[in-house]
């Protein structure tokens, strides 16, 4: 039995650049004025996990549940979006995309070991309203994911042979306001 907490703090960018279009009376046309500001942007998130494992001579049972925020650095689902943009400097504030995922793995036997695996992941969205549809991350348009698998392995000292079948289904969503 165990649990963990992960904190990550990222600087998505260090400067903000854009062009402002304005009327030029000398040419009677439109000109672009470039702007660049140094910005001090940061997104800091916390993620939590709990896991259990039981083993004896014939059984292996393992399970894990994660409530994750912006877990892309760990090859997980999630990311972040923009919750505020400063009108003058274009400095941005961010909010994490949160995912919940859980899985269970059960294996029985010694030489011949049948096993099953089931998993579920759900996009919980952001806790703050987004001001832009631009998202940064992995699986940001995923609503939920279900995985189920069965395996059969033959085990001898230093060798393991087996077959496994896994079915995964994904449901995709859209950005809601």
Regions found by a protein language model. Give the residues of each.
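Detector for outer-membrane/organellar transmembrane beta-barrel domains
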Residues: 1-141
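Membrane-embedded beta-strands of outer-membrane beta-barrel proteins
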Residues: 48-50, 102-104, 148-150, 161, ...
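Generic structural signal for beta-strand residues in well-ordered domains
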Residues: 107, 152-154
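Claisen-condensing/thiolase-fold acyl-transfer catalytic domains that form or cleave C-C bonds
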Residues: 145
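Predominantly the C-terminal beta-signal and adjacent terminal strand-loop region
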Residues: 154-177
């Amino acid at each position: 039995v165990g649990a963990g907490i992960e904190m990550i703090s990222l600087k998505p960018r260090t400067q903000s650049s854009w062009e402002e279009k304005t009327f030029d009376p000398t040419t009677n046309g439109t000109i672009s004025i470039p702007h660049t500001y140094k910005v001090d942007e940061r997104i800091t998130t916390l993620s939590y996990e709990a896991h259990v494992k039981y083993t004896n001579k014939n059984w292996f049972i393992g399970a894990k549940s994660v409530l994750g925020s912006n877990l892309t650095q760990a090859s997980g689902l999630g990311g972040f979006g923009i919750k505020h943009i400063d009108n003058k400097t274009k400095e941005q504030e961010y909010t994490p995309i949160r995912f919940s995922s859980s899985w269970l793995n059960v294996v029985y036997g010694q030489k011949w070991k049948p096993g099953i695996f089931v998993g579920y992941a759900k996009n919980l969205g952001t806790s703050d309203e987004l001001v832009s549809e631009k998202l940064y991350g992995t699986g940001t348009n995923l609503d939920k994911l279900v995985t189920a698998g069965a395996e059969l392995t033959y085990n001898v000292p230093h060798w393991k042979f087996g077959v496994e079948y896994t079915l995964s289904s994904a449901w995709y969503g859209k950005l809601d306001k």
